Structure formats: C-alpha cells, structure tokens
Amino acid sequence: MEAIRKQAAKLREQVARQQQAVLKHLGHVNADAVVVDEEELHCHQKLQDLYSSTKAAKRLQRNIVRGLEGFIATGTKVVEIGLKFAEDFKKYGDENPDANTPLSRVAHHFGTSYKSVEGERETLLGVLSEQVCEPIRTMIYSAPLEDARHLVNHYDRLRQEVEAQATDVLRRRSKLKESDISEEAYIKLKNSESRLAELKSSMKTLGKEATKAMLEVDDQQQNVTSQRLRALVEAERSYHRNALDILDKLHSEMIAEEEAIGSSPKSLPLHIEDSASLPQQEPNSNSSGEIKSNPLGKIKASRREEIKSNPQEVTKPSPKDEMKSSPQEETKSNHQKEIKSSPQEEIKKSNGSDDHHNHQLLSQNDSYFLAKVVHPFDAQAPGELSLAVDDYVIVRQVAGTGWSEGEYKGKAGWFPSAYVEKQEKAPASKIVESNSKQQ
C-alpha cells in the first residue's frame, strides 16, 4: 500500500510539471501561477525521506525490544538453573562430612564462583531491561513521533488539494481563452486562483512545520537508539569481564588444590598396605614408612554397631573378619598381653637412642608398629579408642574395613586407619608415657 501511494505521488508531480511546462510554452501563465515550485518539491521530497527513515528506525526499535524481551526471559531461566547448579556444589562442599578433602574444597569454590557468575548475569539482565528495553519501547509509542507523522499526513492531504485546485485553475483559464470573457467566468477564475494561493501558503507553512518535527523525531530516534545499543554493549562487556575475573580466580584455586595434592607424600593408607602384605621394614631402614592419610575420612556407622566389647578390652573384629584372619593375626593377639605386661622400668633404664626405645617395645612382634595421630577421634561406641593429635599409638592389626586396632594410654580399641600415620621413629618420652599408662 505504501508503494502504491508513493507511485501515485510521483505521477501527480510528473503531470504537474508537464502542465506547467506546456503553459509556459504557450505563454498563458507565468512560472508561479499554478503548480508547485521547486522549493515545495524539495520540502515534499525531504518529508518523504524523513518518513521512511523514522519508519525504518521504528521497525528496528521494535525488533530490538522483541529480541531483548526474549533474551531476558531466557536469561532469567538460565539464572535459575545456574543458581541451582551452583547451590548443589556449595551444599556438597559445606555439608559433606569430609569437608576438608580436596574435592570438597574445590566444590565449595566452584559453587561460590558460579553463584557469583549468575549474579553478574542477573545484573546484566536488569540493565538490559531498565536501561535499554524500556527507553526504546517508550520511544516507539511516544507522542512526538505520532504528532510528527500526523503533520506529514496532513501535509500530504493539503498538497493533494493544491494539485486539485491548480487543475481547476488551468481548466478555467483554458475556457476563457477559447471563448469570450464573461464577468461571471472571470470572477470564478479569480476566486479559484485566490483559493489556490491560500492553499499553497498553508501547504508551505505546514511543510516547514512537519519537516522540523520529523527532523527532531529522526534525530531523537537515531541518538537514543545508538546510546541504548552502546549501553547494551557496555553491559555485556562488564558482565563478561567480571565473569572472566571470577573464573580466573576459580581456575587458580583449582590449580592450587591440584598442586597441593601433588606435593603431598604419595603413600598407601594403612589398610591397603596391610592387605598388600608388604614386608615390615627395620627401624634403621632408609625408606620412609610414613603413610599419607585423609584425616577427615568418613566413618561408617555400621562399623560402630559391630563393636560390642568394653573399651578397656581389645575388641575383636566381626565373625566375617575372623574367618578371613591369617595365622599371623593370631600371633598378634598372643603378643598383645606381652606388650601390656612389659615392665616400665626396663624402658626407663634404657639409655639408648629413640630407635632403641622403639626396638625394645616392638621387637616382641614384627607385625606391630607405631603410628602418630594426625587427627583427633572421639570414641562414640563401646570398643572404640579415643585419640589425641600428635600422640603415638601402638597398632596391632589393620582390618580391611578401614579400621585399626591398637593401644593408646593404657586402653585398647578400634579407630579409623586414616586418622594415624605410620612412623619409623618416635620420641622416647611418648613411648614411656604410653607404657606408664598401660601399667
């Protein structure tokens, strides 16, 4: 429809120019007597260009608003999913019993970082909605644009009236030329010419007013749309820059955790070492017997229920473990009483080094060894043995269930294997203190 209207306007202008040229050639009228002049044609063309420009800009603004609304709706859903995703990691890192393990720490950092990233995304969506989408939507339906378009439409109607009136003037003048001039015909001609002059004057005034209004609207559309697009880009840059900083920090924390794990001693836990039946090393051996452990290993509740005996006595493993026990484990139980009944005076009188103390206490059974407590353990069931950090315990046997049996401060019982580290040497004071408690 718009194309048809433009084509009709071009045809009218072409006909008007042809009529004006013919009349000039015949000498009936002067250049400004009937049809529009060049200034008016220029104004009309300018209004047509401005109308097309504002219409295209309005279409672009509608596309921007429609696209941003979909982007914000989708982004809001992404934020909800991302926050739930991050919360699951934080929950694992904060509520997991092994809260100090590398995975727990990494999960905590991961959840915290991704929650911050989603917070930045939420900020971005707020900026897009308030600073980009709303101003453009307001301009689409603003009064200045509608008023300017109303003036242009009024100008087009008035221009059509001018063309029609000019045609009427030409018709009357042609009649006066062909026949005798009557007073009535002359009066009608003058009235028609006067009407044409009034319409042309109104058209010029309205054309200037419509051109000014359309220029203001066009400038406003261009400037505001460009500014809002720049605000959109700045918001996107800020979001990606902040998200990148957060992810860089998370990456550094994860690398640090991996390096910390790689730099720690790489040795097997107690129960793995026992099941592998490795030969017992001598106290003076050069190889280290220290065992890498996880001080916050998870304690199975089912194992607590299996331990029935008094904490003062040595708790026996379950019947299933007894069936799997070897003659070597029976030898461990036979030597248990010998260690408990060893006289304290013999250890106190020895004047040798720490190796001599360890050898005197443990030489009765090669399968026994000393272990240093690296994490405290509070006994919560009969048969369990409480431990204190930096003290030493005599380990009698290591079960495949992750628990070990040993003596500590005159008491015997079970404790998690991961809470102690095997030692080749121990301070003499610790051994004397341990033996004195047993006596």
Swiss-Prot record:
InterPro entries assigned to the protein according to its UniProt record, in alphabetical order: AH/BAR_dom_sf, Endophilin_SH3RF, SH3-like_dom_sf, SH3_domain
Stretches with biased composition (Basic and acidic residues): 318-358
Residue stretches of biased makeup (Polar residues): 277-291
Keywords recorded for this protein, A-Z: Cell membrane, Coiled coil, Cytoplasmic vesicle, Endoplasmic reticulum, Golgi apparatus, Membrane, SH3 domain
Gene Ontology terms: cellular component: clathrin-coated vesicle; endoplasmic reticulum; Golgi apparatus; nucleus; plasma membrane
Compartment(s): Cytoplasmic vesicle, Clathrin-coated vesicle; Cell membrane; Golgi apparatus, trans-Golgi network; Endoplasmic reticulum
PROSITE patterns attached to this UniProt entry: SH3
BAR domain: residues covered: 32-263
Tissue spec: Highly expressed in flowers. Detected in seedlings, roots, leaves and stems.
Annotated region described as Disordered, given as residue ranges: 277-362
SH3 domain: residues covered: 366-425
Family annotation (Pfam families): SH3_9
Role this protein plays: Lipid binding protein bound strongly to phosphatidic acid, phosphatidylinositol-4-phosphate and phosphatidylinositol-4,5-bisphosphate. Binds actin in vitro. Involved in trafficking and modification of clathrin-coated vesicles.
Assembly information from the UniProt record: Interacts with the auxilin-like protein AUXI1.
Name of the protein in question: SH3 domain-containing protein 1
Originating organism: Arabidopsis thaliana
